Structure formats: C-alpha cells, structure tokens
A protein has these predicted regions:
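Short hydrophobic/aromatic beta-strand immediately N-terminal to the Walker A/P-loop
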Residues: 6-7
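P-loop (Walker A) phosphate-binding loop of NTP-binding proteins
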Residues: 10-11
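ATP-binding Walker
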Residues: 14
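Walker A/P-loop
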Residues: 17
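ATP-dependent NMP and nucleoside kinases share a basic, alpha-helical "lid"
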Residues: 26, 30, 78-135
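ATP-dependent small-molecule kinase phosphotransfer cores
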Residues: 33-92, 98
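Small-molecule kinase domains that catalyze NTP-dependent phosphoryl transfer to phosphate-bearing small molecules
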Residues: 109, 114-169
Length: 169
C-alpha cells in the first residue's frame, strides 16, 4: 500500500478541513492537527471551544509552552504517524501544522513528508498569535487555491490526487 504524508497549512477558514474531506472522497485519508491534543488540555483549563482571537492566542501560547516543556505536540504527531504507517485503512495522512519551525522539524525527521498551503483570498490574515502569523513564512511544496465553489474546489482536489498520489496496492 502506498502511503503519503502531507503537512497542510493555511489561515482559518481557508479550507483545510474541506480539503481533507474532499481528498477522502478520492483516496482514504486521515486528518490530524498538531493542535488537537492541545485543545483537550485547553478544555481542562476552562477553554469553551470557541475560536476567536483570544482563544486562538491561548491555544497558540499553550502549544508553545508544551513544546518548550517536553515537545508534546511533536510527540503526538509522531504517534499519529506511527499509527498511520501500521494502519492499512488509510493511504494519506494530512497533518495540520501552523508554525514554520515545526513544519521544518517534521520534514527533517520524515523525509517523504510534503507540504501544502491552502489559500483562500477571501479570508483575513490573522496576526494576533504566533502560530497564525507565521503561516506564509514557509516555502511549501504545493499551493492549493480555494477561491471558488465547493464543486470547483473538489475538482482542484481531484486533480491534485490524480497528479500526486498513486493508490495502487
């Protein structure tokens, strides 16, 4: 089974989740975000699940703290990759990572990882926290434009899959 790991990035509401859902229509795809486990910790601290500027900064700061303390977010990504490599269910693992230094670290450890930036012109650039502010500070392998309808985006995703993923077993 051919396995592919992509780091995905983009501003909030650029279409990262939609990209993953659409890709899953063409090839079995699992999605994980480097912030997923941090959100669980944040809930223990009283975070209500809202995604506004204040909570985005809180999540970003909490991720920085846990990274500095024991590299927890990266360890959780490694755990996801290990599980994905053993799992016959999925061909593609998409990992959302915002911070350029974390993307570099991941790509340095796992040489086959490729990076994707998803851009949508109608979303505003967020600069209120370190994670979102650094989204465009990386040279991505692929840039996917999401500026049309969902059907148009589906065609973009289909083309990406056809050109970059071999699903032969």
């Amino acid at each position: 089974m051919n396995k592919y790991i992509f780091v995905t990035n983009g501003m909030a509401r650029s279409g990262k989740d939609t990209f993953a859902a659409l890709m899953n229509e063409f090839v079995p795809t699992k999605k994980y975000s480097s912030i997923d486990y941090i959100k669980e910790i944040a809930k223990l601290c009283g975070w209500d699940g809202q995604k506004n500027e204040k909570s985005r900064k809180f999540l970003s700061d909490l991720k920085v703290l846990t990274s500095q303390y024991n590299d927890l977010p990266f360890k959780r990504i490694q755990k996801q990759i290990d599980g994905f490599n053993k799992d016959e269910k999925y061909n593609v693992l998409l990992i959302d990572v915002r911070e350029p230094e974390e993307i570099r670290k991941l790509c340095n450890k796992y040489k086959d990882v490729k990076t994707i930036l998803i851009k949508r012109n109608s979303v505003k650039t967020i600069t209120s926290n370190m994670a979102d502010a650094g989204v465009f500070n990386y040279n991505y392998d692929f840039v996917i434009e999401n500026n049309g309808t969902v059907d148009e985006f589906k065609n973009v995703v289909k083309k990406f899959v056809m050109e970059n993923i071999s699903i032969e077993n």
